[in-house]
Regions:
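Small cysteine-rich, disulfide-bonded extracellular modules of the LU/uPAR three-finger superfamily
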Residues: 9-100, 105-142
Length: 142
C-alpha cells in the first residue's frame, strides 16, 4: 500500500551543535564582551539543503515546487539547548534529497545563523510535505 499523494514525512532528532558560521561566532563573541552590539532580526527561518554548508560558506538550498523557508518559533534556552516549539511543515516540495538545514534571520539580506546535517538524508518527490515535529530541531552550545 502506497502513501497518499502528496506524501508527508516527519523527521525527528535533528541537532545543530556548535555549527555556527564564522561571521555569527565573531558577532556573538563581540556582543558577549561588549565591543559590538548584536541585533537579531526575527523570526528565525529554517531552510532545507541538498548539499551541506560549513563554517565559511552556505550549503545548496532546495529550489523549485512551492518550497520556501519556514518561520521557526523557539523555546526558551535551558541547559545550553533550545528547540523548535511548533511543528514545521515544508509543503509542495520539489523532487530532491534533503541532507541538512540552515537557519537564517529574516532581514533584507538574511544572515546565516547555524547549519547542520540530518542524521539520515530524506528523498522527497514533487508535491510531498516534509515535516519536523515540535522539539525535533535542537540547537545547543557547550
Amino acid at each position: 500500500v502506497g502513501l497518499p499523494s502528496p506524501h508527508s514525512f516527519s523527521l525527528k532528532g535533528f541537532t545543530v551543535a556548535d555549527n555556527l558560521p564564522n561571521v555569527i561566532e565573531n558577532a556573538l563573541l563581540d556582543a558577549l564582551v561588549g565591543t559590538t552590539a548584536y541585533s537579531m532580526t526575527g523570526p528565525v527561518m529554517l531552510a532545507l539543503m541538498t548539499a551541506n554548508g560549513n563554517d565559511a560558506s552556505a550549503g545548496t538550498e532546495v529550489t523549485g515546487g512551492s518550497y520556501g523557508r519556514v518561520s521557526m518559533s523557539m523555546t526558551t534556552a535551558s541547559g545550553g539547548s533550545i528547540t523548535n516549539s511548533a511543528e514545521l511543515n515544508f509543503t509542495g516540495m520539489p523532487t530532491a534529497t534533503v541532507v541538512g538545514v540552515e537557519l537564517y534571520d529574516s532581514n533584507g539580506s538574511p544572515k546565516r545563523l547555524a547549519y547542520g546535517s540530518l542524521s539520515v538524508s530524506k528523498a522527497v518527490t514533487s508535491g510531498d510535505t516534509l515535516q519536523f515535529a515540535a522539539s525535533s530541531v535542537t540547537l545547543s552550545l557547550s
